[in-house]
């Protein structure tokens, strides 16, 4: 996906970390959105579908 912005890598006191990725978009009534996360600790990528009421 193009035009994705990433935050700096941020660490918590326990050394866990997070990274925010975002992109501007204009949703329509029929669009469906999902986020896919790949990580070495996951056996397969995790896909989360975003609900309309979020």
Swiss-Prot record:
Q: Which residues form a coiled coil?
A: none
Looking up Pfam families in the UniProt record yields:
C1-set (PF07654)
> According to the lineage, what is the superkingdom?
Eukaryota
- Keywords for this entry? Immunity, Immunoglobulin domain, MHC I, Secreted
Q: Which GO biological process annotations does it have?
A: antigen processing and presentation of peptide antigen via MHC class I
Which species does this protein come from?
Answer: Mesocricetus auratus (Golden hamster)
Q: Name the cystine pairs.
A: none
Domain named Ig-like C1-type is located at 3-41
Q: What family is this protein classified in?
A: Belongs to the beta-2-microglobulin family.
Whether Secreted counts among this entry's keywords is yes
Q: Where in the cell is it found?
A: Secreted
A GO cellular component annotated for this chain's UniProt record is:
MHC class I protein complex
Keyword Cell division in annotation: no
Describe its assembly. Answer: Heterodimer of an alpha chain and a beta chain. Beta-2-microglobulin is the beta-chain of major histocompatibility complex class I molecules.
The name this protein carries in UniProt is: Beta-2-microglobulin
What is this protein's function? Component of the class I major histocompatibility complex (MHC). Involved in the presentation of peptide antigens to the immune system.
């Amino acid at each position: 996906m193009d035009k994705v912005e990433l935050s700096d890598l941020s660490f918590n006191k326990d050394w866990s970390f997070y990274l925010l990725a975002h992109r501007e978009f204009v949703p329509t009534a029929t669009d469906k959105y999902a986020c896919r996360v790949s990580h070495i600790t996951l056996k397969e990528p995790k896909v989360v579908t975003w609900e309309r009421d979020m």
